[in-house]
Amino acid sequence: MITKLIPRKVFFTSGVGLHSEKLESFEVSLRDAGIEKFNLVTVSSILPPNCEIVTKEEGLKELSPGEVVFCVMSRISSNEPGKTLSTSVGCALPRDISKHGYISEYHAYEENAQDVGEHAKKLAGSMYSTWTNEAPLKTFSIPRSSSVQESGDWMTVISAAVFII
């Protein structure tokens, strides 16, 4: 029998990491977001039908270190001093929970968190409306922004929607 991997729950998180090595700055951003213990697999932009949105704390209780975890992630890195890095995931909730919604990911240089968050909400809402010909029940986003320090160390900023099967 084939088991369908349809997430039951989702939580949203973000993080910032700084390190002299690019890869390690990503690891630090995962730690800041609280999702460093998992083998993350990025997926595209569907919020499954009947998927419950939970807090990060509730979601983390259901996951185990080393578990393969699916997520929609926005990620950006740079070591250019003073450069602003911003990420966001946006979500469009369906009017009927038995239908799917959308999750968008967006990142940008030199844009603030509010603008990136608004853009991610707009993307998710647009994907939903062009499918249903109606506005979503609600849109929201989880933006994060930070500026690279003068030291020139690598900075990585992430935002993620993390699924629980």
UniProtKB/Swiss-Prot annotation:
To which protein family does this belong? Belongs to the PdaD family.
Enzymatic reactions? L-arginine + H(+) = agmatine + CO2
- Show the InterPro entries listed in the entry: Pyr-dep_his/arg-deCO2ase (IPR016104), Pyr-dep_his/arg-deCO2ase_sand (IPR016105), Pyruvoyl-dep_arg_deCO2ase (IPR002724)
Q: Which organism is it from?
A: Methanosarcina acetivorans (strain ATCC 35395 / DSM 2834 / JCM 12185 / C2A)
* Superkingdom, natural source: Archaea
**UniProt modified residues of type Pyruvic acid (Ser):** 45
Requisite cofactors:
pyruvate
The name under which this protein is listed is: Pyruvoyl-dependent arginine decarboxylase 1
Residue numbers marked as site, Cleavage (non-hydrolytic): 44-45
- E.C. no: 4.1.1.19
Query: Coiled-coil region(s) at which residues?
Result: none
Q: How is the cofactor bound?
A: Binds 1 pyruvoyl group covalently per subunit.
The record's listing under PANTHER family reads:
PYRUVOYL-DEPENDENT ARGININE DECARBOXYLASE
Q: Which UniProt keywords apply?
A: Decarboxylase, Lyase, Pyruvate
Q: Which GO terms describe its biological process?
A: arginine catabolic process
Matching Pfam families, A to Z? Answer: PvlArgDC
UniProt entry tagged with the keyword Transcription: no
- What top-tier enzyme class does this entry carry? lyase
GO MF annotation terms: arginine decarboxylase activity
State the SUPFAM superfamilies in the record.
Answer: Pyruvoyl-dependent histidine and arginine decarboxylases (SSF56271)
